[in-house]
From Swiss-Prot:
Pfam families: GP120, GP41. GO terms for biological process: clathrin-dependent endocytosis of virus by host cell; fusion of virus membrane with host endosome membrane; fusion of virus membrane with host plasma membrane; positive regulation of plasma membrane raft polarization; positive regulation of receptor clustering; viral protein processing; virion attachment to host cell. It comes from Human immunodeficiency virus type 1 group M subtype J (isolate SE9173). Residues 568-586 are annotated as: Immunosuppression. This is Envelope glycoprotein gp160.
């Protein structure tokens, strides 16, 4: 009975252990799976290329904004919305802005390279006031007959023959010359002492053409579509585009011209609006038209300054000498300022004052821009001269004045280059009348700081500013950012790659540090370990070679006649090839070429991510998942690479044994010929050895003084000296007295040797099999005894553990019961004592009364 109970207990324990093992084994293992083409990206800096509709504009050789090196624009640009995506943007740290700045500077420099330097014109100019040839009436409020507008200057220049000089004359604007003495008759060009002056080419046009910046293959441009986006921070309405919208690179100050407008309300953008040192970019939600005119009809003349050098200057003016000017609708402008002030009050909650710049270069203190090839500098003090408090900011009637604001402008022909100091250009005069219409789409403002800005009186003063052209580009690129696509992703799945299983061999870590040619002197086996390293370094060499090629092209672009856009096209194409090669290289190393989903035999490590399988695939995006495992991506890649290397090694070893997998191939005629050849070689070897041994035996016997008569000589078998050769009646050991017969003939000799060899091999093989069988039997018996011992040991300790547990439980129960009884008894005594308190009081009172 006790034995039966023990077996039942053992059966229960066995079922319990088996169930636990089943539960543990029920948990499926996860394996690393490679995905190609996942929607993952990261912030990046890359070379953008341009797209433009070049056919709609002049393609003349010296057009500054010539875009014939750009790709044509896509007639149907695609924009893909990214739902459930939140991306951070920062317009103040955007590489696209820096890149556009460099591109526009390069375009300006490249367009002015072949043009004439007018440094020889830095001579004394004898100037007098200019009067017009005839007079016409003018109703413009900007009319001015002041002789201070232009000067008629004469000067000596070198002719085509270097040793001869002649006197020429030209008309210069007053702002372009400075007097060198007090008689106001001798002048010099304004920038001769500080700058290298270069004349813009006669055919150069400064009319900006819309440029679309595009990302190369492997990169994308993210676009923020929030209507109230201020340029920094997270954006929840994100889409992806291949190219930006058409951006006109308008070089202007104070007022942003011909840009894009806000779709909703006016937007105020600043890197830190509480810091008065930071400029404020105002994007309007409605345009204000500005019409600028140079009314006088100029003519242009050419002055030969030497061989191949011609200076183009103003010859004469037909009509009144009138100043240039710009007209703006007062109603539209005041309404715009009112809405801008209202928006600024949301940030400062004070009276908003607009006033003119406090000082600086003429490019900053005026609204400078290019109109029809002439550089205008307009005084905007009339525009920025208003104050908006809480009362008049709500009064829309105050902005209903339908008159026109006319702001006076000056024209300069010697213009300081905006991209760098110490350089200037001479803009040749444009013949005829000039009129251009533009749309004001934004403002560049700065806020006064210190105690003089009236902030202590509840007033904030804002002034127009400019000069940093990056702010102009930011006003258009604020909603874009460049990202690099990361198409390779890894994630855990339940699928495992079926591989050739084989024990892994440890590879020395020093192998990965070998150079591309470091294994040239090693064996083929040792060099095969570093094949992956060699592929990587080969790709790096290709990339480096292409990079050097681009540097050489960039350095010699003036010889190759390449524009900055042509260089960018080359860079974009090379970059796309590099990206593709890099991804395909990794897929090839991992054994995943041509696959979008590639399973591996690398187990997923829970330390990389402790999230469950369902949580990963059902609740996370690829972007979130990549951020989760970003720190372990390199480790995972290396494990996949090692697993693939081991797999290829196993496949090579398997292919080496593949011919043994089909026994029928053993009977192939080619194999039979091989078998016959081997048999003949073995027989020939045995015969040769037999002949050698026979010759050696003969030589040995000859040295002993005798020689056998023939191979048929019977040699008596030696017997012991103390035993007779025979026994009576024919008995005894007759077999031991017989002679050994030598074989007769060549075939008999070969057969005897082969038979002896086979018998020897058979006996040895039989002995080995018997020994192996005896050993296996002994080991099996010992193993069975050890297994039974372990089972009995486990059963014994199980019983002991069970008895100990029962004893511990009984002891605990008894202790708890005794403790409980005592607690109950104490509680009862306390309760009775409380109940007896009134009785004791009554008894005490009775005794006191008695």
């Amino acid at each position: 009975m006790e034995t039966q109970t023990s077996w039942l207990s053992l059966w229960r324990w066995g079922l319990m252990i088996f169930g636990m093992l089943m539960i543990c084994s029920a948990r499926e293992n996860l394996w690393v799976t490679v995905y190609y083409g996942v929607p993952v990206w990261r912030d990046a800096k890359t070379t953008l290329f341009c797209a433009s509709d070049a056919k709609a504009y002049s393609t003349e050789k010296h057009n500054v904004w010539a875009t014939h090196a750009c790709v044509p624009t896509d007639p149907n640009p695609q924009e893909m919305s990214l739902p459930n995506v939140t991306e951070n943007f920062n317009m103040w740290k955007n590489d696209m802005v820096d890149q556009m700045q460099e591109d526009i500077i390069s375009v300006w420099d490249e367009s002015l390279k072949p043009c004439v330097k007018i440094t020889p014109l830095c001579v004394t100019l004898n100037c007098s006031d200019v009067n017009s040839n005839n007079s016409t009436d003018s109703n413009s409020s900007a009319s001015n007959n002041s002789p201070e507008i232009m000067k008629n200057c004469s000067f000596n220049v070198t002719t085509e023959i270097r040793n001869k000089r002649k006197q020429e004359y030209a008309l210069f604007y007053r702002q372009d010359v400075v007097p060198i003495n007090s008689d106001n008759k001798s002048y010099i060009l304004i920038n001769c002492n500080t700058s290298v002056i270069k004349q813009a080419c006669p055919k150069v046009s400064f009319q900006p053409i819309p440029i679309h910046y595009c990302a190369p293959a492997g990169f994308a441009i993210l676009k923020c579509n929030n209507k109230t986006f201020n340029g920094t921070g997270p954006c929840k309405n994100v889409s992806t585009v291949q190219c930006t919208h058409g951006i006109k690179p308008v070089v202007s100050t104070q007022l942003l011209l011909n840009g894009s407008v806000a779709e909703g309300d006016i937007i105020i953008r600043s890197e830190n609006i509480s810091d008065n040192a930071k400029n404020i970019i105002v994007q309007l939600n409605d345009t204000v038209e500005i019409v600028c005119t140079r009314p006088n009809n100029n003519t242009r003349k050419g002055i030969h300054m030497g061989p191949g050098q011609v200076l183009y200057a103003t010859g004469e003016i037909i009509g009144d000498i009138r100043k240039a000017y710009c007209n703006i609708s007062r109603k539209d402008w005041n309404n715009t300022l009112r809405r801008v002030a209202k928006k600024l009050r949301e940030h400062f909650n004070k009276t908003i004052d607009f006033t003119s710049p406090s000082g600086g270069d003429i490019e900053i203190t005026t609204h400078s821009f290019n109109c029809g090839g002439e550089f205008f500098y307009c005084n905007t003090s009339t525009l920025f001269n208003s104050s908006w408090d809480e009362n008049n900011i709500k009064d829309t009637n105050s902005t209903n004045d339908n008159t026109t604001i006319t702001i006076p402008c000056k024209i300069k022909q010697i213009v300081r280059m905006w991209q760098r100091t110490g350089q200037a250009i001479y803009a040749p005069p444009i013949a005829g009348n000039i009129t251009c219409k533009s749309n004001i789409t934004g403002l560049l403002l700065t806020r006064d700081g210190g105690n003089r800005n009236g902030s202590e009186n509840g007033t904030e003063t804002f002034r127009p500013t400019g000069g940093n052209m990056k702010d102009n580009w930011r006003s258009e690129l604020y909603k874009y950012k460049v990202v690099e696509l990361e198409p390779l992703g890894v994630a855990p799945t339940k699928a495992k790659r079926r591989v050739v299983e084989r024990e892994k061999r440890a590879v020395g870590i020093g192998a990965v540090f070998l150079g591309f040619l470091g294994t040239a002197g090693s064996t083929m086996g040792a060099a095969s370990i570093t094949l992956t390293v060699q592929v990587r370094q080969l790709l790096s060499g290709i990339v480096q070679q292409q990079s050097n090629l681009l540097k050489a092209i960039x350095a010699q672009q003036h010889l190759l006649k390449l524009t900055v856009w042509g260089i960018k096209q080359l860079q974009a194409r090379v970059l796309a090839v590099e990206r593709y090669l890099k991804d395909q290289q990794l897929l090839g190393i991992w054994g995943c070429s041509g696959k979008l989903i590639c399973t591996t035999n690398v187990p997923w490590n829970a330390s990389w991510s402790n999230k469950s399988y369902e949580d990963i695939w059902e609740n996370m995006t690829w972007i979130q998942w990549e951020r989760e495992i970003n720190n372990y991506t390199g480790i995972i890649y290396s494990l996949i690479e090692e697993a693939q290397n081991q797999q290829e090694t196993n496949e090579k070893d398997l292919l080496a044994l593949d011919k043994w997998t089909n026994l029928w191939n053993w009977f192939n005629i080619s194999n039979w010929l091989w078998y016959i050849k081997i048999f003949i070689m073995i027989i020939g070897g045995l015969i040769g050895l037999r002949i050698i041994f026979a010759v050696l035996a003969i030589v040995n016997r000859v040295r002993q003084g005798y020689s056998p008569l023939s191979f048929q000589t019977l040699i008596p078998n030696p017997t012991e000296a103390d035993r007779p050769g025979g026994i009576e009646e024919g008995g005894g050991e007759q077999g031991r007295t017989r002679s050994i017969r030598l074989v007769n003939g060549f075939l008999a000799l070969a057969w005897d040797d082969l038979r002896s060899l086979c018998l020897f091999s058979y006996h040895r093989l039989r002995d080995f099999v018997l020994i192996a069988a005896r050993t296996v039997g002994t080991l099996g018996l010992r193993g069975w005894e050890i297994l039974k011992y372990l089972v009995n040991l486990v059963w014994y300790w199980g019983q002991e553990l069970k008895n100990s547990a029962i004893s511990l439980l009984n002891t605990t129960a008894i202790a708890v019961a005794e403790g409980t009884d005592r607690i109950i008894e104490i509680a009862q005594r306390a309760f009775r004592a409380i109940l007896h308190i009134p009785r004791r009081i009554r008894q005490g009172l009775e005794r006191a009364l008695l």
